[in-house]
Amino acid sequence: ALDTGASKCIVKDLREEFVRDYCFKALSAGAIYEDNYLLGTALARPLLAYHQTQVALEEGADALSHGATGKGNDQVRFEVTYGAFAPHLQVIAPWREWDIRSREDALDYADKHKVPVESSKRDLYSRDGNLWHLSHEGDVLENVWNAPVKEMFKLTTDPMDAPDEPETIVLAFEQGTPVALDGKRLGPVEMVETLNRVAGAHGVGRLDLVENRLVGIKSRGVYETPAGTVLHLAHRELERLVLDRDTLHFKQSISVRYAQLVYDGLWFSTLREALAAFVDETEKEVTGEVRIRLYKGTADPTGRRSESSLYREDLATFGEGMAYDHADAGGFIRLYGLPERVRAMTRDEVTVDVKAVEITKPVGRPGGETK
């Protein structure tokens, strides 16, 4: 930054805050956009934008700037957060204001002004990487029929080249937050880095999808999220074990709305914070362990246990057991199905009355004739 003309450069290590307060919060909420996207980019933007505003206020700056394009979601995520914490500052968005219309234009500008960048015209993918994921967009992926090329991936092994032997891991959670791997307690950053390495080696965490952007267009992205994929799977399995049916089902609806708020750049909204309070309540008993097998691009749960488990073998068994009396089911079914039985009886009574009318009451024909 200093070499390219900046008068001052401030660097902050936000990794711990990012994983602990953003990724793991979204994990506890079960936030997955459109059933697939684990929100790696969407989670990072409010954190970056918030700290931008704090530095700008501390330094007495009169403007904020970002490098997001005019077609994407990131411009919204940055600027909504700017507005939440520094609404008086001017926003400079070069992609919208300068004569830059493509990645080639941006690369030409960088080359002309001696700005070092990793991309080149031989590799025009638009990538966004952080601890939680690595995304790939653009280039050959803009044709949704084109398959991703093998060389594009950075975090995950091709499942065809992954080890021929599966690897089993055990993840431990405390109140919905991952705290240990294979019996070893890990901090948030170390947890994600380790799982990225372990799961990525088995080709776990690849995702190719077409998503609906906030700005109204569809886009295609290929994502690598090894740690996030495994953690979401394990967390979901543990919740199924410890949450009652009504709470679990209602939380699933909350998860969808939570994910949309994050995707749309509304991390600091009142609604997102209110939903987070609900999530915190549901997670109080989500403590336990989940065993997962990693093998050639797949992650499968093979065991789960918790002191808060609502699963009872003596109730679920198909063998002999005295805890559940099968005869009790008959009364439950009659009461549970009573509304349907009443509706059927009411329907039958109406049908009889209608038939009686058809038989006894003459029906007029044109010309006054009756039958």
List PLM regions with ranges.
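Nucleotide-activated chemistry modules centered on ATP-dependent adenylation/adenylyltransferase
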Residues: 1-371
